[in-house]
Amino acid sequence: MKIIYEPKGKALEYAPLACNLYKGCPHGCRYCFGPTLPNPAKKGLTMEEWRREWHSKTVEKPDSLAKLESDLSAMANKRDTRPVLLCFACDPYPPDEPKKITRAALAAFEHHGFKPIILTKGGTRACRDFDILKAAGGWFGQTCSFIFDTQYGAGTQECRKAWEPNAASMMDRHNAAEIADAYGIPVWWSVEPVIDKDQALAFLTVQSEHEVSKSDHFKLGKLSGYDKETKAIEKSINWPEYREAAREILAGAGYTEIFEPGVFEVGTHYVKKELRDAK
């Protein structure tokens, strides 16, 4: 296929298929793996220089919509009905989204009868497309590494902004989830990377028991250290303790643990292998 692909490794646990509409993401998340992917544009640059370039702007991939139309048409002809996640290596709702490509992509999914799975840190920027996301039968997902800004005080917001400087605030993401729920769109959360296990557990408690917009599905991961700082954080966390505490919270709220990767079912949660096997 031309732009839709089958993820490998850890990403395959999230969805059977994925599509990255853009290159680059100005959310500037320190844990972003996008800059580590192969890209001829980074030739001659240090990793730090390339990270700055990657996080400076969002660029549409050449002919992304035409390629998506072609792939969806081919999948329809093969009766391949697997859902497609948007996006792993970029964000479908960056602050500088060019030409509203994501909305056009969702229209293509609806036209061809495929279910899109959104994963974003753009918060309420995504709400403008909820009409078409619902029509396409899609899911709305967001990444969470921290608790809502107002619950742990100003320090929480400062901590989040240090890691995700230009992403939507956690309260904005919470508001987006509530609006999606009001539209009748299934809502899910990707709870990783875990920077502070207490915040992650507090988030699970709040979001799994929320009376207005209880989440439909959770995918739980950990933190995989990639530099001195994140390796130190990873080493400092008791992952089996975190995993079992998270399971207890979700089971107590009525969620069933599922073990098939890439599945989205209402009332369930999935623990990624890396966290499941952590010792």
Give the residues covered by each predicted segment.
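Generic intrinsically disordered, low-complexity segments enriched for polar/acidic and small residues
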Residues: K2, C19, G28-R30, M47, ...
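Generic alpha-helical propensity signal that fires on short helical segments
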Residues: K43, T102-A104, Q207, K273-D277
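N-terminal [4Fe-4S]-dependent radical SAM core
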Residues: M1-P83
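Conserved AdoMet/S-adenosylmethionine-binding subsite of the radical SAM
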Residues: D63-I249
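C-terminal accessory extensions appended to soluble enzyme cores
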Residues: G225, T230-K279
